[in-house]
Amino acid sequence: MEFKKYILKKFDYNVNVSNKKFYTPDETIKQKLEINVKFLKDRKNMLLTFKIDMIDNDDINILNLKVKYILTLNNEALDISESFIKKILSKFYPIFSKFILNFYNSIGLNNIQLPEF
């Protein structure tokens, strides 16, 4: 099953501005990815929520990010299984990834890759 369109519904982030630390490229920055999928009543639209928490080696919070999309499928989903959801997410994740990497670069978090899906 393919998706027809997607709409960015919400983009919210919080950067820890009290953290004055300068990060070097050899430091490890950990990211925790959480994905929530909810099918809407018509079973053709789904709400995707991505959350990313970024912390440094000292467990200091660097960034919290929450992005919500409405994803419209070509057809109504008849069988909503874990494998079906993974298939849809694997097709959408590159779009999400490109958007977030551009955001990371715009706020100076260059060369940071997203966690694997």
Give the label of every model feature segment:
Residues M1-K91, K98-F117:
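N-terminal intrinsically disordered, cationic/polar leader segments
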